[in-house]
Amino acid sequence: MKFKYCLNESVKTTVQPKTKDELKKIIEDTIKEQGFNCDLNFIDTSLIKDMRDMFAESKFNGDISKWDVSKVENMRNMFAKSKFNGDISKWDVSKVENMSTMFAKSKFNGDISKWDVSNVEDMRYMFYKSNFNGDISKWDVLNIENMSHMFDESPLEGNEPDWYKD
């Protein structure tokens, strides 16, 4: 089967969606053709500002480690109820304002300790009922207006970072 976004059988071309809906369609097409563990790094996400619900309730667990998310402002519910547990440690999330329920009820437990979350205002229920147990003690959370229930029913409940205020 020839993959939709390939120049030939082994060389993927880069595609640059201009909208969230275009991005979602490319992801769905690729997963349908290659499975849930596919590599999505051929997608240039540098124009996308909203990734809300992008992988919510998905079985996707492939590679998106090289995605340029530097313009994204909304990651609400992005991986909620998903199986995703890939490497997103090098993502530039410095423009994100909303991370509420981003990993709620998800399998994610990757390293996000070096994320710049200084512009995030909403982290409520971010790790609610998730598997997350990472070290985020050095996050700059001065801008956060709402972090209620951020760690409820997660491994970090009772072991929250010092900066946490419910």
Each model region followed by its residue ranges:
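Negatively charged
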Residues: K2-D166
